[in-house]
Amino acid sequence: MKKENLEEKPFLQMKGISKFFSGVQALDNVELKVYRGEVLALLGENGAGKSTLMKILSGVYTKDEGDIFIDEKKVDIKGIKEAEELGISIIHQELSLLSNLKIYENIFLGSEKYKGIFNKLDKDYMRSESEKLLSTIGFTADVDILAKDINIGEMQMIEIIKAISKKSKLIIMDEPTTALTEVETERLFKVINKLKSEGICIIYISHRLDEIFQICDRVNVLRDGKYVGEVKVKDTTKDDLITMMVGRKLEEQFPYKKVKKGDALLAVNNLSYKNKVKNISFEVRAGEILGLAGLMGSGRTELAKTIFGEYKKSSGDIYINDKKINITSPKEAIENGIAYLSEDRKKEGLILNMSVGNNISLCNLKKYENSIKKINKEKESKEIDDYIKKLSVKTPSANQIIKNLSGGNQQKAIIAKWIMISPNILIIDEPTRGIDVGAKKEIYEVLNEIKSLGKAIIMISSDMPEVLGISDRILVMSEGNLSGELSREEATQEKIMKYAVAFSN
């Protein structure tokens, strides 16, 4: 149950917060308050200033203007340690557990306990205390297991326990359900409700608006680095929140574009990969977006990586323009006009410490070589700038380090990288994961533009409205099998789900 009668005095209040980076204003007079035992949603498009504001609160950045109050007492947060001493913890979207440490070692990392005159690590105490802490949120695990051997949902629980172990009074959760299953999300929500009942404040950042109505009490909205307003969840609607976030109504959230279909550009026949992909056959045509739906673990990504040559097929055939092709590596796939955009853009799609421009031109450097194999920088820069403009990548310049861009702009840069090589077949895995509603629409428009040029797109997505909204045709996978095919006209969420569980036990 959501808390309705919030106490009058906020635990945290941020007033008039402003922040500048190299003369560019990232936050402009932002307000935020949160009460004990409340879940406050912090909403805004990518680039709205949410991360910057939370980094100020958690001590990663210092504010340039404004005041922060904890229990009505003015505080000056100058570092992460100071924030933690004030009871503020943050659980980042990219979880921070050290994979080669055990669970109990991760929980006590930085606050290890020692015993005896020789100051020896008190492992027994840390083990037993870790087990007690885990039990407080109804979670059991072998605390001697290495972090690399547990799943994302379990990692999330350990991160929460780390925050609790530090006696946190306020926990910031940044996109906590991005990689969670439905069952893991439900478990997380139970834990959040338990924390609420103990008077702990939660600031909850998510692009999944349905979750806001499930778990949050109030919503604080930012846009373009400015405070837009706050509203109680019970007094608002999804459409109202979208309007607050983007400053306009998204009447057409999924801008479908009808394009005349051409011949099959790609066909696969009885394609298999180990026990993950089982005798799959389909084709995708020029001017078509083929949606690929299914539950997590259904084999969609494995199918994509097998076509792209990242995984070696066990059996079956791949045809491009009716010609049988043997693809044994991504390099061969690219040479045959196939591009693949991974679901994990930060690990597999980008080199985070490189510039936007270098990331975009990375797969196409040969194009800029002159007769002595030297890169023509002027030609490269011009084309990079053209693609930045064409895809509306919001960046101060092509020289900006790409990790500083919002998720939506990073994704557009990856798309620019791949369409720069002029592929005929684009496989895109979870194209809008972790991207705000405004940037999603921009991505859909880019995909529509690509298909209108006579290219074929295979779009893997776990976002059901997205699959229904922009696909021309939908294939559904279940347990490695192709369980169903639906035309745009006949497809519904119910039909997709029926096929998605067709091969489940």
From Swiss-Prot:
Localization terms from the record: Cell membrane
Keyword Transport belongs to the record: yes
InterPro entries registered for this protein in UniProt: AAA+_ATPase, ABC_carbohydrate_import_ATPase, ABC_transporter-like_ATP-bd, ABC_transporter-like_CS, P-loop_NTPase
Residues the record lists as binding ATP: G44, E45, N46, G47, A48, G49, K50, S51
PROSITE patterns: ABC_TRANSPORTER_1, ABC_TRANSPORTER_2, RBSA
Key words, A-Z: ATP-binding, Cell membrane, Membrane, Nucleotide-binding, Repeat, Sugar transport, Translocase, Transport
Location of the ABC transporter domain: 12-249, 259-504
Pfam families recorded: ABC_tran (PF00005)
Membrane topology of the entry: Peripheral membrane protein
GO cellular component, one term: plasma membrane
Signal peptide positions (record): none
Keyword Repeat: yes
Reactions catalysed, as given in the entry: D-ribose(out) + ATP + H2O = D-ribose(in) + ADP + phosphate + H(+)
GO molecular function: ABC-type D-ribose transporter activity; ATP binding; ATP hydrolysis activity
Function, in words: Part of the ABC transporter complex RbsABC involved in ribose import. Responsible for energy coupling to the transport system.
Family the UniProt entry places it in: Belongs to the ABC transporter superfamily. Ribose importer (TC 3.A.1.2.1) family.
Subunit structure: The complex is composed of an ATP-binding protein (RbsA), two transmembrane proteins (RbsC) and a solute-binding protein (RbsB).
Protein name as catalogued: Ribose import ATP-binding protein RbsA
Lineage, uppermost ranks: Bacteria, Bacillati, Bacillota, Clostridia, Eubacteriales
Gene this protein is translated from: rbsA
